[in-house]
């Protein structure tokens, strides 16, 4: 074995424990506790393996006093390393930096660059202003290590201002040092990884814990046929034998096959209250444990008792690595008051018509060494229903889900709950999601904001500063969608071609609440579009179909059949969704001008191309009435639903950008043009301001 091989093995072992090679790291993660009992994590350090082989490691941390972010890269090369930040993962317009240690002099170099306007325009371009400061760098026979920093906001039009959003972090490895004048990024290896740069991240090794055990929960050979575009599959499992109460400290996904070929879109593990329904046979649960499972949310196939499986304990979405909790909180399992059964729900998304057999699930990490607080997960946002509507052809259209005082005043403890983290969830049209917080008529700082949401990269947003939510507070999940290239309305639903607007909130102390949702009241939804009655169905029947997932055939024996069928030709999967939609079965009788038209057909004829009309619809849905639901763990619906108006409050105003040039960062053409434009514009603006002041003084 060569000396280089030995060094490589040593480096790999060190990195596996989150240590930086050749570095004496003085930062020790700690935390403060404020007067409300909320934890504020300080001095945290993130360390991420950027590739699948451990050739490129990126470490970073925030220095809030300096408004700076520090980076350290350790790369298996004696050539160059590239690092970049992008909203969409493309090299074009990316904020980039090239790094290397000169082979001749040993001098470390960090070069601030940006991607050309078009990828075909050539290699990255050097920035006029260099905003990365190199701190240290060295190399040995196999590896290059560089440490550098930059301001979070540099006021350079070619640098992306860093934030809590999800960024696509680009990386590249080159065999040789860059040749003078040649900034070619295309090295021997390159890739992209979605990261949240402002979030700490906890792992099994964040704090020394003895006695950690694992529990693997998977489905058994679920077959996904080519014809299945969307499938929700549920499997009941029994808690393993435990010696008293334990704490779940984290969980990871167990995915079948390679990531790029996997059809698993979303997974949730729920607690089941097996004694919730009178007359239920307790022995049925053990029978279900031995079965392979069945289709979820089916009136015909899903046992009614499974409705009691409503409290999440583990959540995974596409692009996530799972979650580990901070050292003072753990999700309880087992013990005298714990549940015995859990339900694993897996959402399969199969748009390409693949045939596969799946055995995915979770690996649960737990310990008998109990932590200070019992933690829980609750779901908040828009109730999944076709009453959530997103018009076609929209660059930005918002929907909101409200968790209001009907839940928080009743279920939250006097001192409130403390939010640890949140997973934001929508489907393909989602672009921006935030979890907003309102108290006493004033909106506080948003708890979570991701203005660069990507449904393919739904990582947990771990909070550096926990947020207290008190009884009487509102939580508002606010989602923005883009449907520029869609020709028909998009509705709320379970397929990725339909939409959701949810936040999975991890918090403590645990309360007996699993969900807090809202939706547009059914009657108001139809009246919004001047529809008041359907053939042979009164509006109460229609409301029941939406609220309780009732079968249309139970109400429609006398209903008029005027289903809107797609045009002749090949039927797309979107056509199938529209054909099966309840809105496509409801035939309008009042008003007369719309009679004999399905409600779906009626929606398709509305002037969605008119921005004033669409804006009125958006605002009417947001500021109008909302039906709120408080789902309690011990009962399927113990707190009655309530119809409320959107709360009146003073909205939170984001602080103005510290940098003038950032006013134009949304305009990609300007941002990627010549920096001379910004220089000229800034000088002109300053001159105008000076002239204005002189005029005022005169």
UniProtKB/Swiss-Prot annotation:
The keyword Ubl conjugation does not apply. Its cofactor is Cu(2+). Cu cation B binds at residues 425, 427, 500. Residues 1-20 form the signal peptide. The active site is at 232, 425. GO terms for biological process: dopamine catabolic process; norepinephrine biosynthetic process; octopamine biosynthetic process. It is found in: Secreted. Disulfide bonds join 272-309, 403-516, 479-501. Its main location: secreted. Its EC number is 1.14.17.-. InterPro entries: Cu2_ascorb_mOase-like_C (IPR014784), Cu2_ascorb_mOase_CS-1 (IPR020611), Cu2_ascorb_mOase_N (IPR000323), Cu2_ascorb_mOase_N_sf (IPR036939), Cu2_monoox_C (IPR024548), DBH-like (IPR000945), DOH_DOMON (IPR045266), DOMON_domain (IPR005018). Belongs to the copper type II ascorbate-dependent monooxygenase family. This is MOXD1 homolog 1. It comes from Drosophila melanogaster. The lineage of its organism: Eukaryota, Metazoa, Ecdysozoa, Arthropoda, Hexapoda.
């Amino acid at each position: 074995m060569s000396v280089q091989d030995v060094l490589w093995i040593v480096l790999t072992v060190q990195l596996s424990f989150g240590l930086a090679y050749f570095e004496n790291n003085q930062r020790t993660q700690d935390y403060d506790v404020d007067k409300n009992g909320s934890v504020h994590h300080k001095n945290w350090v993130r360390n991420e393996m950027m590739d699948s082989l451990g050739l490129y490691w990126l470490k970073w941390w925030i220095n809030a006093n300096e408004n700076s972010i520090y980076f350290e890269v350790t790369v298996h090369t004696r050539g160059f390393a590239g690092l970049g930040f992008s909203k969409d993962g493309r090299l074009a317009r990316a904020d980039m930096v090239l790094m290397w240690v000169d082979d001749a002099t040993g001098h470390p170099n960090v070069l601030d660059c940006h991607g050309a306007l078009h990828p075909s325009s050539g290699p990255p371009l050097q920035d006029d202003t260099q905003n990365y400061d190199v701190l240290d760098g060295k190399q040995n026979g196999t590896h290059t290590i560089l440490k550098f920093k930059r301001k979070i906001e540099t006021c350079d039009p070619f640098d992306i201002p860093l934030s809590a959003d999800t960024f696509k972090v680009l990386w590249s490895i080159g065999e040789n040092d860059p040749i003078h004048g040649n900034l070619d990024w295309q090295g021997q290896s390159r890739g992209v990884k979605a990261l949240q740069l402002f979030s700490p991240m906890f792992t099994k090794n964040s704090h020394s814990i003895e006695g950690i055990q694992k529990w693997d929960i998977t489905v058994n050979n679920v077959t996904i046929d080519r014809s299945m575009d969307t499938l929700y599959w549920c499997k009941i499992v029994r808690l393993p034998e435990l010696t008293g109460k334990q704490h779940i400290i984290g969980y990871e996904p167990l995915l079948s096959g390679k990531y790029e070929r996997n059809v698993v879109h979303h997974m949730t593990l729920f607690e089941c209250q097996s004694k919730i329904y009178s007359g239920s046979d307790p022995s049925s649960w053990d029978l279900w444990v031995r079965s392979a499972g069945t289709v979820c949310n089916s009136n015909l196939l899903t046992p009614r008792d499974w409705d009691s499986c409503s409290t999440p304990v583990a959540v995974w979405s596409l692009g996530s690595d799972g979650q580990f909790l901070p050292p003072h909180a753990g999700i309880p399992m087992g013990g005298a008051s714990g549940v015995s059964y859990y339900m694993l729900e897996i959402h399969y998304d199969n748009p390409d018509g693949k045939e596969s057999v799946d055995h995915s699930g979770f690996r649960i990490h737990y310990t008998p060494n109990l932590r200070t607080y019992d933690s829980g997960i609750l779901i908040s946002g828009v109730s999944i229903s076709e009453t959530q509507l997103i018009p076609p052809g929209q660059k930005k259209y918002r929907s909101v889900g409200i968790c209001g005082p009907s839940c928080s005043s009743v279920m939250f403890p006097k001192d409130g709950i403390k939010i640890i983290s949140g997973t934001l969830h929508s489907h393909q049209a989602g672009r921006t999601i935030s979890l907003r917080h309102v108290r006493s008529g004033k909106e506080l700082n948003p708890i979570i904001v991701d203005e660069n949401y990507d449904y393919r990269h739904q990582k947990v947003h771990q909070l550096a500063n926990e947020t207290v939510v008190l009884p009487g507070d509102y939580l508002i999940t606010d989602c923005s969608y883009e449907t520029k290239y869609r020709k028909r309305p998009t509705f709320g639903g379970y397929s990725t071609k339909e939409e959701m607007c949810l936040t999975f909130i991890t918090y403590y102390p645990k309360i007996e609440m699993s969900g807090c949702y809202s939706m547009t009241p059914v009657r108001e939804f139809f009246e919004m579009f001047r529809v008041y009655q359907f053939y042979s169905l009164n509006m109460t029947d229609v409301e029941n179909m939406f609220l309780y997932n009732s079968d249309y055939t139970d109400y429609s024996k006398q209903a008029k059949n005027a289903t809107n069928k797609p045009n002749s030709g090949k039927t797309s999967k979107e056509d199938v969704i529209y054909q099966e939609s309840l809105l496509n079965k409801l035939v309008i009788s009042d008003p007369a001008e719309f009679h004999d038209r399905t409600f779906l057909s009626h929606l398709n004829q509305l002037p969605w191309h008119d921005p004033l009309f669409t804006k009125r619809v958006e605002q009417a849905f947001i500021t109008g009435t909302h039906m709120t639901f408080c789902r309690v763990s011990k009962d399927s619906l113990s707190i009655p639903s309530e119809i409320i108006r959107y709360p009146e409050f003073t909205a939170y105003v984001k602080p103005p950008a510290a940098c003038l040039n950032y006013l134009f960062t949304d305009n990609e053409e300007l941002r990627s043009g010549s920096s001379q434009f910004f220089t000229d514009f800034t000088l002109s603006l300053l001159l105008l301001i000076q002239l204005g002041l002189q005029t005022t003084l005169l």
